[in-house]
Amino acid sequence: MSRRRKAEKREVLPDAKFGDVVLTKFMNCLMYDGKKSVAESIVYGALDRIEAKAKQNALQLFHDALNNVRPYLEVRSRRVGGATYQVPVEVRSERAQALAIRWIISAARGRSEDTMTERLSAELLDAANQRGTAVKKREDTHRMAEANKAFSHYRW
């Protein structure tokens, strides 16, 4: 971490189809080897499948899924006198969004459907309905923070 100055945040342009910045961030996290067109086709294909399957606005369902996976508490390690404590801290909104995106993508990659489009659409539908691996990850994170509430006075 630099001591001189804080690195400025890069501005992410909205995506072409929906004009949504969060969707672009999602595609950027999904992308491998700079192949943005592949990531776009996967995400747009998944949103089309959601629209066909759920008969709802796919973008709204995407944002609902993201909000259902966003954590508001997490644990951070803190060394105090030779012992390491897991201290619960609140999650900043930018980090919460980044974690939600990462968790949804990793949960989708771990699913058993044939194509990534199918996996992603299924995981987004599950997350929007408060189930699935990504939501379980969030619940586990919150449970960890709740279990270590006794160490919250070590917060910095």
Swiss-Prot record:
GO terms for biological process: translation. This is Small ribosomal subunit protein uS7. One of its GO terms (cellular component) is small ribosomal subunit. It comes from Rhodospirillum centenum (strain ATCC 51521 / SW). InterPro entries: Ribosomal_uS7 (IPR000235), Ribosomal_uS7_bac/org-type (IPR005717), Ribosomal_uS7_CS (IPR020606), Ribosomal_uS7_dom (IPR023798), Ribosomal_uS7_dom_sf (IPR036823). It comes from the Bacteria. Keywords: Ribonucleoprotein, Ribosomal protein, RNA-binding, rRNA-binding, tRNA-binding. SUPFAM superfamilies: Ribosomal protein S7. The keyword Glycoprotein does not apply. Pfam families: Ribosomal_S7. One of the primary rRNA binding proteins, it binds directly to 16S rRNA where it nucleates assembly of the head domain of the 30S subunit. Is located at the subunit interface close to the decoding center, probably blocks exit of the E-site tRNA. Gene3D superfamilies: Ribosomal protein S7 domain. One of its GO terms (molecular function) is tRNA binding. Part of the 30S ribosomal subunit. Contacts proteins S9 and S11. Belongs to the universal ribosomal protein uS7 family.
